[in-house]
Amino acid sequence: MKKDIHPKVFNATITCACGNEEKVLSTKGEQVNVEVCSACHPFFTGKQRFLDTAGRIDRFRKKYAKFEQK
């Protein structure tokens, strides 16, 4: 078998924007930041919530506003 072909595995802490932290094994690094996790995602919480943190809806409306004029 070949030696040293497997990625390094870290004990990582995943930190959500809501403040929730989870300890997992990861090959990405020791600290991973995410915007949404199971503690705050509407599917897991059962609560309807607006999740546009990156301004995607505003960008879409601005881009296609010229077609709405007609």
Curated annotation (Swiss-Prot):
Binds 1 zinc ion per subunit. Keywords: Metal-binding, Ribonucleoprotein, Ribosomal protein, RNA-binding, rRNA-binding, Zinc. GO terms for biological process: translation. Signal peptide: none annotated. The keyword Metal-binding applies. Its cofactor is Zn(2+). Disulfide bonds: none annotated. GO terms for cellular component: ribonucleoprotein complex; ribosome. Zn(2+) binds at residues 16, 18, 37, 40. One of its GO terms (molecular function) is structural constituent of ribosome. It holds the Pfam family Ribosomal_L31. Binds the 23S rRNA. Belongs to the bacterial ribosomal protein bL31 family. Type A subfamily. NCBIfam families: L31, PRK00019.1, PRK00528.1. Part of the 50S ribosomal subunit. This is Large ribosomal subunit protein bL31. It comes from Desulfovibrio desulfuricans (strain ATCC 27774 / DSM 6949 / MB).
